[in-house]
Design a protein with these regions (language model features):
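Conserved small/polar residues in nucleotide/adenosyl-binding loops
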Residues: 266-273
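The feature captures the beta-strand-to-loop junction immediately N-terminal to the Walker
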Residues: 32-37
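ABC-family P-loop ATPase nucleotide-binding domains
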Residues: 72-75, 81-142
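ABC transporter nucleotide-binding domain
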Residues: 171-187, 191-257
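Conserved ABC transporter NBD signature motif
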Residues: 58-69
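Catalytic Walker B motif of ABC-type/P-loop ATPase nucleotide-binding domains
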Residues: 154-158
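Helix-to-loop junction immediately C-terminal to a conserved catalytic motif
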Residues: 50
Length: 277
């Protein structure tokens, strides 16, 4: 069954190459996690996939049809991202009610009842201006648009970033329900690989301007270990291991590595633990 396909996508901003010859096939009816550190090119790739940002070279197709400048193909794809001063749907000084109305025009399969139910469930005041919403409410509004769009392929950029733990769990349950009941495809970007365990069927990791790996989540996590602590200690611990993701969290350094042979892995003390000793 056809889906969304990227072929040899490259993109640079002035002299900074962000994506280099990226090829990727997204099958229909799956939940994908797009993982990589901040600044690795996740948002750039997603915006190219949805025709919002032209690539320097390569092509994107949906069911064999070009996505760029193709309204029919794009009508099956929703890219819902953090709302900025000026967003896809207009100025964010509009009230939530008007913002949702504009979304209903843009997405042909818009589910008004779902949007209304989710707005009530998450306590969003429709009379409030979008620009006056908290970060958590902005994230939830982004999620609502993605879900209520009913697009066959729905792409969400760091949707859980502003959500607390309870709401985040409810969000992921909604995603899983939509995929199981309606066969929708979701691509969800995050820099937190631990979120993959119970949600994503496949994980795509961007690193060094390209797709570093694409693998079944269960199989990948069986091979991986998460190591965190003082940067020097962590680097010594994983020396010689295949690092698939890394991030700095305050003064701590965390990496996800592939278990490889006799590579010794351990979690070193955090800076706070070190200060206490």
């Amino acid at each position: 069954m056809s889906g969304l396909e990227c072929k040899n996508i490259s993109k640079s901003y002035k002299d900074n190459k962000v994506l280099d010859n990226v090829s990727l096939n997204i099958e229909q009816g799956k939940i994908y996690g797009l993982i990589g550190r901040n600044g690795v090119g996740k948002t750039t790739l997603m915006s190219i996939m949805t025709g919002q940002n032209p690539a320097d070279s390569g092509e994107v197709t949906y069911n064999g049809q070009p996505v760029w400048e193709n309204a029919e193909a794009l009508s099956h794809i929703c890219f819902s991202r953090e709302i900025n001063t000026k967003s896809l749907l207009g100025m964010n000084n509009q009230k939530v009610k008007e913002y949702l109305r504009l979304a209903s025009i843009y997405y042909k399969n818009w589910d008004k009842d779902m949007a209304e139910e989710l707005v009530k469930r998450f306590g969003i005041d429709k009379k409030k201006k979008v620009c006056n919403l908290s970060k958590g409410m902005l994230s939830m509004l982004t999620v609502i648009i993605g879900l209520a769009s009913k697009a066959e392929i729905t792409i969400l950029d760091e949707p859980a970033a502003g959500l607390d733990v309870i709401v985040r769990e409810e969000f992921y349950k909604l995603i899983i329900d939509e995929q199981q009941e309606n066969g929708r495809t979701f691509i969800i970007s995050t820099h937190i690989i631990e979120e993959a365990a119970n949600v994503f069927e496949e994980v795509i990791i961007l690193k060094d301007k390209c797709v570093y790996l694409k693998e079944n989540t269960v199989e990948l996590l069986d091979k991986c270990r998460y190591v965190s602590g003082l940067e020097e200690n962590v680097k010594n611990a994983v020396d010689g291991c295949k690092i698939i993701n890394e991030e700095h969290i305050g003064r701590s350094y965390a990496v996800t590595v592939m278990q490889d042979g006799d590579c010794l892995l351990y979690t070193s003390p955090s800076p706070r633990d070190t200060e206490r000793s």
